[in-house]
Amino acid sequence: DFKQSKIWLDKSLELWELMMTHEKFNYLTNRGNDYYYQKDYLNCLNTFLQTDTFLRAHPELEWEKYICHSNIVDVYLKLNQPQNADSLLFDNIAFFQKMQSETVLPYLYTQQMELAMQKKDYKQAEQLIQKHPLPEGTKPDHILARLDFLQRYYTEQADWKKAFQYQKAYNELNDSLRDDRVRMRTADLQMRYERDATILNQKLYIGEKETQLLQTYTWLAI
C-alpha cells in the first residue's frame, strides 16, 4: 500500500532531527526501498545516493555503507547502466566475502551475473552460474531474483526449455510468497478487527454500567 507508506514515511521525516544515526540510515533505506518496489528507479537511485552521502560522515558504519552500495548497484542494473555498477559491485563482493556473509553474497553473485549479461559477456555469465549455485537457506527474495535472472538469461540464449523451467519456478515461488503475504495481511486485519470489537464491547459494557449507576442514583434521590 504505497499511499499508506508515503504517509508514514512523510510523518517519519518530520522527526529527522530527533533520530539517532542508525534510525536515519533505516529511514533513508526504507524510503529508497519504497521507490524501488514502485519501480520508480530514478527517485530510488537519488535516495540511495543521498544515503551514501549521509554515510560518508559516519565512517564507522562500514557494513551499512556496503549495503547501501549494493542497493545502488541494484538500481544501476535496473536502469541498464552496467558501467556505473561495475566498480561498486566488485568492492561489495570483496567486503562481504571478507565478512563471510552467506546471507548477502548469493544476491551479489546474481548481480554479478546480471552485470555480465548486460555487458554481453555470456561466457562469464555462464561461468558464474556454474560457480555460484544458491546455497541452502538462501532468502526467498534472493531466490526469486536468481530465478528471474536465469529465465531472462536463457531466453536471451534461446534455450527455451531452461527459460520455461526457470519462469515456472519463479511464478510458483512468487505465488507462494504472495499467498503468505495475503495470509499475513488477513491475519493482521483480523487482529485489528478483534481488537476494535473488544474495545467497542468494553465501551458498550461501561456505558451500560454507567446507565445502571445513573438509574440507581435516581432512585436514591427519589
Show which residues each predicted segment covers.
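Hydrophobic positions within repeat-based interaction scaffolds
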Residues: 86, 123-126, 130-222
